[in-house]
């Protein structure tokens, strides 16, 4: 199936454990993380998600199924205060949406706040900047990429890895985030660390997570598609039979990720 778009902008369980690397960019942890309540929550009862919180660490454990219906359980750890700071990096003060005097100084200050909050401004619209969020959260997703390679092997194909990780994020319970978290506007998006602390996420948040994992391999050419209030993904390459694909700048981008993650 070819799609043309105008673009804007039970079985045994295999256990694998990964200790995540630390991020060299964070030395002054800040704040606590507010517990959020999702709307329209849905969960596959066969999957399992847990997080153990100590003074120093978050210990994550996720059970999910593969495309071949084999069950896996991944576990990994991350420093708690560092993770909190990574979460608190995303989000913008609600005052940025209030009227202001457009002096040169105010405009520069406003633009700086938008950028450092991992948001972007396009015309009169201020929204999360996925292009900056994806590389920013790669430090958190590095253990997930390492677990993918350990699970599938270094000889696995790019498509096999994408399909496997797609099932991983699909088995994360679905829930729509609120517009605010930790006294900041988050526009209904959870950062990758917060997805696992909350143990749920919506479509856009899961696309962000998946993109941040795959970003560890430069060979993945990923295009994010904003369509009907959803964020979808497409990959550059030769489509398989029955794959949905689009034509973008003369290149085939195949295998769109559905909006019902």
Where are the language model's segments positioned?
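Bacterial N-terminal signal peptides that target proteins for export
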Residues: 1-8
């Amino acid at each position: 199936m070819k799609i043309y778009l105008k673009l804007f902008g039970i079985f045994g369980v295999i256990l694998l454990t990964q200790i995540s690397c630390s991020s060299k960019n964070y030395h002054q942890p800040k704040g606590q993380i507010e517990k959020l309540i999702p709307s329209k929550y849905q969960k596959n009862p066969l999957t399992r998600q847990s997080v153990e919180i100590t003074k120093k660490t978050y210990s994550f454990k996720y059970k999910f199924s593969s495309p071949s219906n084999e069950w896996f359980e991944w576990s990994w750890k991350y420093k708690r205060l560092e993770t909190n700071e990574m979460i608190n990096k995303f989000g913008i003060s609600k005052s940025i949406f209030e009227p202001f005097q457009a002096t040169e100084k105010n405009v520069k200050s406003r633009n700086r706040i938008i950028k450092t909050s991992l948001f972007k401004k396009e015309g009169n619209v201020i929204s999360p900047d996925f292009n900056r969020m994806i590389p920013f959260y790669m430090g958190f997703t590095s253990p997930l990429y390492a677990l993918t390679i350990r699970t599938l092997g270094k000889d696995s194909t790019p498509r096999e890895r994408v399909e496997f990780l797609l099932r991983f994020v699909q088995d994360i319970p679905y829930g729509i985030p609120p517009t605010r978290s930790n006294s900041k506007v988050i526009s209904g998006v959870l950062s990758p660390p917060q997805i696992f602390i909350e143990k749920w996420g919506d479509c856009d948040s899961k696309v962000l997570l998946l993109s941040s994992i795959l970003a560890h391999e430069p060979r993945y050419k990923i295009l994010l598609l904003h369509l009907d209030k959803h964020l979808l993904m497409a990959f550059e390459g030769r489509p398989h039979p029955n794959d949905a694909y689009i034509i973008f700048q003369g290149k085939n981008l195949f295998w769109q990720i559905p909006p019902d993650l």
